[in-house]
Amino acid sequence: YPYKEINQEEEKQILADFNCQVIHHTPEYQTNLGINTPTNRILTSMCSPERLLFIIKYGIAYVKMEKEVDGKIESTDQKHIMRYQQMFAALAIRQQLSDGATSGVVWHTQGSGKTALSFYLTYVLSDYYAKKNMVAKFYFIVDRIDLLEQATQEFEARGLVVSTANTRAELMAQFRNNHAQEGTSGQQEITVVNIQRFAEDKQKVELPAYATNLQRIFIMDEAHRGYKPGGCFLANLFDADPSSIKIALTGTPLLKKDCASSVV
């Protein structure tokens, strides 16, 4: 990005407004003026006009939090802003879909906010497919009941309407409903699926015919773990809907045959 020259008078005025004139000649301040410092490059690349508009539209979430105040539990809405790795991942996914990809792996380290990324993706990809006259339906796949409960809490705290599927029957009931939304609230929805209890189910998955304007999107959490995709329910599920989008999230992108990331 082209950088404009710093107006020295404006610089002095800004420092004066914050009562920070004394730092002007310090070595640390002069270093921070460099355009190639890591922090400056991240901030300026994130705040380019296109990306800043993207953050304003998709990158703000209000998370319901509870805290104790004077012995009472109060509920507040805490504003969360999309982190840089979440923004770059969302932009990359959208670009890859535009280039014709239908699957891919997002490699984000532990603590980078993969569940929050999935929340943002429900809005980013819903808009992406709306422009194609298609309706996106989201499934978040985990492999333990505690992860299902954790993801459900995280999504609900951010305002998503969450359905859960702990058994094959529950998931098939979800698939038989060809509507993009299960409820009537009009809020964004996601289905959280615990694959653990029926991962070894090798029975062929029969999906009912559905309108061509419905786009299923599967997001797999911790995809480096042993989902055992070969000849199991997960593989059969993907085969039953070849037009679905598969996004694997992992901090350890192993490509062994027993990991979901190898299939995606």
Question: What do these predicted ranges mean?
Answer:
Residues 126-127, 169-177, 203-207, 232-235:
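A generic local structural motif
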Residues 1-142, 146, 150-162, 186, ...:
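ATP-dependent helicase/translocase motor core
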Residues 1-3, 7, 197-205, 211-264:
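Signature of the SF2 helicase/ATPase Hel1-core->accessory helical subdomain module
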Residues 145, 165-177, 195-200:
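Conserved helicase motor
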Residues 169-191, 209-210:
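Conserved motor-coupling elements within RecA-like helicase/translocase cores
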Residues 140, 191-193, 218:
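Hydrophobic positions in the central parallel beta-sheet of the AAA+
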Residues 105, 192, 246-248:
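Conserved beta-strand scaffold positions in the cores of enzyme catalytic domains, especially
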